[in-house]
Amino acid sequence: CARRVAVGAVAKGYAAGAVAAALPTGMVLSLGGNVCVTGPKPDGSPWVIGVQNPDGDDTEYVQRLDITSGAVVTSGDYQRYYTVDGVAYHHIIDPDTGWPARHYRSVTVICADSGLADALSTAAFIMDEESGRILLETYGAEALWVYADGSASWTGGCDAYFHS
């Protein structure tokens, strides 16, 4: 019996972090739901990173974040999915059920390391919010959860990033 290891939950984040590490200070690298910031803008101000509204188009945001360095990574159910008999099935599978996780529309994680942010956003997407908060606190990361009804919740440290 052949065994396979799927690294999709961290591969893009790891790759983004590796590329960002080679960039000069003050750059933004965006690979879809993985964004790395290597320092503030040349004028010293933060970069504004949008958290996409899962029900909107690419220009609609649930929140905008002021980021001077680190990673912002989103896992969601609204871009990579297929439809069977009118039911959408996305790619983030809950290992307890074997079916796509249905807690949220998206989870966005903010932390220093892109690979870690990628892994945490996927893990938090599968977990209930309370368990996700405990996991994120362990790694010093922040997160924003978007629910199917459009409501959102976030860790306390996110307030410092919210663009005014």
What would you call each of these model-derived segments?
Residues 1-164:
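Mature catalytic core of soluble alpha/beta enzymes
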